[in-house]
Amino acid sequence: MLNFKFLKCVYLCFMVFVRLILIIKFRGKKFMNRKFVISLLFIILTFLLILGCDLSINNDRNKIDGASHFKKKYMDNLNYQCLSKKESEAKNSQIKLDENNNKNHFYSSRVSNVSNYYDRTHISCKKND
C-alpha cells in the first residue's frame, strides 16, 4: 500500500513537470527543441522522484538492517538489559501488580529515560542503573 509521503512526492513532481511544460509551451521559441527539453525534464524529474521519495519504508531489508543495528548497539552492551516481547510484558505486568499492592505511591511507574529503546522486532532494552 502506498503511503502519504510517497503520494505527496509524486504529486509535487507532477506539478513541477506540468509547470515546466507550460513554460516551454509559452516560451518555446527560446528553447532548442521542445521534445528534447520535455524528455530531458521527464528524465530529470523521474530521477529526482526516485531519489527524493522513500520507496522502501517497510521492506524486509530495512527490517533486517534495523535488527542488526539494534543488536550491535544494545545486545552486546553490558549496560543494557534486553528482553523479548513476552518477557517485557510479564515484567511490566509484575511491576503493575507490585505498584497496586504498594501503599507508598511516591514514585511514578512511567520511565522517561532517553536511553531506553524499543525496536520494531518487539525487543525492549533498558539501561541498567
Curated annotation (Swiss-Prot):
Q: Which UniProt keywords apply?
A: Cell membrane, Membrane, Plasmid, Transmembrane, Transmembrane helix
| Family note | To B.burgdorferi BBF20.
A Pfam short name: DUF5425
Q: What species is this protein from?
A: Borreliella burgdorferi (strain ATCC 35210 / DSM 4680 / CIP 102532 / B31)
Give its localization: Cell membrane
Q: How does this protein sit in the membrane?
A: Multi-pass membrane protein
Question: Where is the chain membrane-spanning?
Answer: 4-24, 37-57
Q: What is this protein called?
A: Uncharacterized membrane protein BB_D15
- Record-level GO cellular component terms: plasma membrane
